[in-house]
Amino acid sequence: MELAIGCDHGGYLLKQDILIWLEEHDIDFEDVGCFSTESVDYPVYAEKVARAVAAGECSKGIVICTTGIGVSMAANKVGGVRCALCTDCLQAEMTRRHNDANVLALGAGITGPNLAKRMVEIFLSTEFEGGRHARRVALVDSIQP
């Protein structure tokens, strides 16, 4: 599967907009929740996305909460996940190109739906450059708690 996507209640409406965009572009995805605006705990859904990516069940992931901060912190606790909180298109591009991020974090209270969909498009279509960046990503991946 290409993509796992999840959110808490604060990210639910933005996630719905992104799901429509994914369907319109025939992008295969797994929606791990949440499924309403009723209050839930963001780490649960960030972990579901992160584990799907780390296990190779999905090649990339998207996590959404109100700011994107909590879900990015939670996703990055899972080994093999490189989650980047992005607020603009340049960040979405460069986090793939130079950092090989495999999970995109979005803040629904920060980023509107049109910008978010453009960032998702860029994140999904941008390839990792490798080269000197691969060495740096390996250094990041080698850092242990």
Please report, for each region that a protein language model flagged, where it lies by residue.
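A short beta-strand-loop structural module common to alpha/beta enzyme folds
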Residues: 28-39
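Short, structured active-site "lid" loops
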Residues: 45-63
